[in-house]
Amino acid sequence: MSALFAGVVLSFTSCNQSYTVGYLYVTGTVTAQSSGEGIITGIEIDHNTGKMSAVRGTPVSSGGANPVRAVLLETSRFLYVLNRGATASGSADCTTADPCKNSNITLFTVGGNGVLTAQQTFFTQGINPFRMIADNSGSHLYVLDHDAPDSAAYSGVTPTAANPNSCMLALGNSATSCGDITAFSVNQNTGRLQLIVNAPVTAANGSALLYFPVPANPVDFAQAAGSVLTLSGTPAASYPYTGGTSVFPYTYSAANGQLTINQNSSQPLGIAQGTALVYASGVVYVLDNEPITVNFNDVVTTSSSQILPFVVGSNGALAAEPGGVIPDDPTLSNPIYLIVESKGKFVYVANQGNNTQGANAQSGIAGYFITTSPAYQLSFIPDEPFGSGAGPQCLVEDPSSQFIYSADFNDSSVTGRVVDPNSGVLNNLRVTNTYALQGPATWCLVDGRTN
């Protein structure tokens, strides 16, 4: 990507030019407010130093309460924020028994200098939406709802073979409860979302089903090549939803965004506390927050959590990488997100730790070398783990491939690091490492279009 030199500032102490290489957007809430009203903070990234400074006019309202995900389309013109809403008591702890209300997807246009302008609001078909992705072309948007509207666990109505609900119709007679995926097509001129109906499945009343059921208790999902994979598991008593045990595949159509079931059963992973599913550089990574002792590169390693890498086969089937499971850094826990840096040499894993308040010694960033010959394998980068703010929720690499940023929940900050391109070590920025937010961060993304 070529950077456009808008607003170049010349330094008289250096031959370097300083300019904005991209914009970092962080969703979250405001600590001073009890309503959970969401905000989006825009941050300019300096090309030379990685310094963070405010985008004019931000933070702006996210369009609802408790934003949890944001997606920027490939064109960088449209940004979508998923607001989870709040329970009847005003809590952000959305559960099947106490669901959140007034959830929505708010569309923003991205203007000059990274300015965000709210446009329209859209809604999912299910209950408790909490994850959102776009396909690679930016033509389709998908939202994962924790509960389908007629799921027995949510509705309290037990379906029968004579009177099935959507879960049974799509997933088989034993599936009386389920989550769902709401799918949209994206108008490339306006960003407006249009609902995609479930063509293969007809509702019990004969009408088209307006969503795509997935197994009960979903945790996370991702598009992986020609499939959309959903990690599901055991019921979670509170948000965030964890306990992932298996992965269910839908076949994805790039032409129309349609999702089609190719097998009715999930693939068990042999884990009990899956926290996230990430597709990066051709590999599916499942993050699992339970202890493991393993011989890792000829060293017996005991960790509080682990990473399971897979290759996606036909019909979305997962095949474990030959190198087997990967231990998390022994000093960290509760992995929540993973990125592969742009050159494909290093993997970084954000661990939010198992503490939920204040400073968190178990949170930070684990780092790995990637080896692909003779087989895929990871090995720890020397001097890892790397510091972050407390409770990182996400990781992004800046458009110039120099810096890695985390957005942090517990201490309401963004933390930046410089990537050593040879060793993969994440060093401190030459300027201030952190950027203070108005409240806890929940997600982050980066935009490389600066004109």
Task: Cite the ranges covered by each PLM segment.
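Sec-dependent bacterial lipoprotein signal peptides
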Residues: M1-T13
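Predominantly soluble domains enriched in secretory-pathway, periplasmic, or organellar proteins
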Residues: C15-N451
